[in-house]
Amino acid sequence: MKRDTDISQEVALIWNTANDVLRDIFQRTEYPDIIYPMVLIRRIEGVMIAKTEQLKEELESQLSKVDKKTQEQILNGKILQEIKFNNTSGKTLAIIADEGESSIKNNFIAYLNGYTDNIKMGYVFEELVRKFSEANNAEAGEHYTPREVIDLMTHMLNMDEKAIKDGQLVTIYDPACGSGGMLSAAKEFVEEKINPNAKVVLYGQEVNDKTWAVAQADLLLKGETAYITKGDTLYEDGAAGEQFDFMLSNPPYGKSWKKIQKKVLANSNGRFDVGQPRSSDGQLLFTLHMISKMKPAELGGSAIAIVHNGSPLFSGDAGSGESEIRRYILENDWLETIVALPTELFYNTGIATYIWLIRNNKPKHRKGKIQLINAVDFWKPMKRSLGNKRRRIDETQINEIIQIHKTFDTGPYSKIFELEDFAFRKVFLDLEETDENGNPITEEKEVTVAQNKLNDTLLIKTADEKKRLAELKDKKGKEGEFTFNLNPESELATKHKTADASITIRKALDGNKLGLKASINVPKIVKDTEYIPWKDDKEAFLKKEVEKKWQITKEEKGYEIPFTRHFYVYQPLRQAIEVVYEIGLLEKENTLLMNELGINL
């Protein structure tokens, strides 16, 4: 990140102070709880004192004409008007320290208040957040996304294509904003790369109380126009009814939402109607939430960059919540690009991660198309690992990825697909079992036959069959078994998928009542499913892939994005002679080493 202000001395001073003063008294993970508030408080005091002295000079003639109480009222009013906060306790940190420990608590409580605009201290605060996050790497992934990932996401949003003009309002939103790093970086990008005169307003939400407070402090110290709400985005939508120009986020992945599922669905307000992912992983809910905040395309539309692990690409079968969410995004032609990032890039996980770029204002040449970018090899090793983070993406590599995205062409790291390339049919089949000679295998099945449907169910042609049918219906006749041919067009034959079968009916008499029990031999059916690419002819596919006689009973459409499959490169196995030769060399080397040790084999 580029900065015009050198903050290294201030950061070093605070960092070293924390190590010198707090060590052995507090755990390292507790340092931020003490340092963050003190940095904020000290900055507030500095701004307040400087503004008070400035106003005293500017209002000297006016103040000299009134009493002390009126002077304080005038000064306090002016300070509130210009810097939006003031401290009327009449104390400073130095005064509180001088007054001794006995009264420090009460004096300190009375003293606390307010935030202000100072870009240098804002950067100091952000840098401290980063350093403490890295030092406490087990916690870092909860609220801190590596800067290079944020930079890549902001570049890929293609904000410059919006031609942001002077004074134009630009809204940026992060529903899982953590310490606010993504929001700050996005604003910097607009001001440094696009238009410094744009009016950028930041919106965010964070569920963790401490992290929310850090985000508030960081953004307020920088003087950002920001609205950060506290609460769970999934059931406490802090931006209800709002729409934004740009959205970016790194929500928790692989995190269960089972405990809050009822509250989420009760407060969805239509956000999650298209489908819900399994309760063990709620990350796709954040995607749907952000989509619900998109501006209509006719009003300029919106762009979203969100980080996911691999699960949202393929988890869930056809008809599942995950598949239906993918279907919703793809069939609306909102998915523009997915970038596979290097592993070991984040602080608390080494797994594969992906940036999804979603927009409802895709340029004409991208409509109906999806770009997959394989950037897993775009990394440099870190000099010192930070938890699971052992790799970084440098500025040159970020620019290479951005260029691949802009070029929008097929190559070693990029592939272009149509929407239906990711669709498939899940076909449910009934397969008829056959013996080794290919003859159908049948099994006896109990069925119900109503007396008033006997004529329709049975195939009666001969006089003998008519006679036996009459005997079967006769309530005064003999009990016994009667065998007939089954009418192939009957409801019973259709239901049990047997057109050429006999039916055995057992007649029983109970007084004046006629009881009928029947059984038929039906083909032995095995249930099966086949997954067929949507663009393939299903009949041709089944004829080629399924040997047994089949009947389609049901179909479902699903979507998955098998990212790694599309970039798989076959590595041929080595020749056996090469392997044998190397084994021989190793055996000779082993023998020499053993001989040197005086061991004869």
Task: Place the predicted regions along the sequence by residue.
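Active-site catalytic pocket residues across diverse enzymes, especially alpha/beta-hydrolases
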Residues: M48, V190-I194, M294
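Conserved Class I SAM-dependent methyltransferase catalytic core
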Residues: E30-R43, M153, Q216, Q276-I358
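Short, contiguous acidic/charged loop-to-helix segments that flank catalytic cores in large enzymes
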Residues: I25, K258-D281, G310-S320, P342-Y347, ...
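Feature representing long, continuous alpha-helical segments
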Residues: S184, A213, S249-P251, L284-L288, ...
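Short glycine/proline-enriched turns and hinge-like loops at secondary-structure junctions
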Residues: R28, D166, A240-G241, T349-I351
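Flexible, glycine-/basic-rich loop-and-beta segments that form/coincide
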Residues: Y347-E446
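Conserved S-adenosyl-L-methionine
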Residues: E139-S249, Y253-L265, L284, H308-G310, ...
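Non-catalytic, mostly N-terminal accessory regions of nucleic-acid modification and defense proteins
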Residues: M1-E161, Y227-G238, A340-T343, K367-N374, ...
